[in-house]
Amino acid sequence: MKINKLIWTGILSFAVLFNAVAKDAIHQNEVYDIYLTYTDSTYPGDAVFLKISFKENKKLKKKDKTATSAKAKIAFNDKILFNTKFYSVPEKLSKTKNTFIAALPLSSYAKTGTYDLTVIYSYEGEPNMEFTVPVEVNSKDFVEETIPLNAQNTEIKTNTSPERMSQIEKLNGILGTINEDAVYQITPFAQPTTITRRTSFFADRRTFSYSNGKSSTSLHYGIDFGCPNGTHVTSCAAGKVVLAENRISTGYSVVIEHLPGLYSLYYHMDELKVKEGDIINMGDLIGLSGATGLATGPHLHWEIRLFMNAINPDQLCENFLFAPAAAQNK
């Protein structure tokens, strides 16, 4: 992941730097500066992260102030792929005022090339402004594998019972929830286990071979660690436990909310050590690994969802939200 940083003090200088023209031609640098840091080089299945902050140069009258707002969208060949709003970062986490973050997931099938990243914002009642910067999506190869399933796992995989459908609906409802106040951590995340052996990788292209001779294809949404039964599983970041239960397909499972629309998921555990509603820190014990649910052997499945889209968990173990070094060391 490559990071680009921009300090903009006016439309004209920005247009020269990025060969982009703002739709509103008002020169704003007498009122404020905008600082932008964003992911400008990435891979399919990753996310594009953005952070903006404002420095006020001219004191605005209280009557002119309204809430600062911003949105971002990413497009390829003039087709908008995803859009989202920016979310405010508490000053205790960002150590600065007027800091906002946003994230845009990319499909693991995203084509290589230059994408257009557009930011639209309004600072405390000032006119809306818009600018576009380039993001390069590089090529990446993904593993293709065939997984034979015994009769028990075939039954789980093909289970269409009301109970399983209800569990899927509940999980999707959680992953589709965007809590604007849920900003628990903006520093790099950590791996959820000390085990380093990986048995499956993010976005593997899978074919399941059923015991009845049939088959189906799917995408592997996370990373599998080859953990012996009973291995400690820890939270990859601070957050709130929003699901902790035994599910038909994923066994003993935990879902943790970390940022608006961003969740970590932990599957196939043997025992849970947290309950729904718990507020936890990075590294807290949440369960013991196992082989519950659809599993061909003991392992931990770790997954990250952003606005319901699976993204590469390893990216979040980097400085994905551009936190200062001092904040990362805490």
Give residue spans per PLM region.
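Short, well-structured beta-strand-loop connectors
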Residues: 232-241, 274-289
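Flexible, gly/ser-rich surface segments that form the specificity/activation loops bordering the active-site cleft
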Residues: 242-247, 284-298
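Acidic, glycine-rich catalytic/binding loops that coordinate metals and/or anionic ligands
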Residues: 142-170, 275-281, 303-330
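Surface-exposed, glycine-biased beta-strand/turn segments
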Residues: 134-250
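Cationic-aromatic interfacial patches
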Residues: 22-143
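Zn2+-dependent peptidoglycan hydrolase active-site motif and core
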Residues: 236-270, 303
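Bacterial N-terminal signal peptides
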Residues: 9-16
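Bacterial N-terminal signal peptides that target proteins for export
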Residues: 1-8
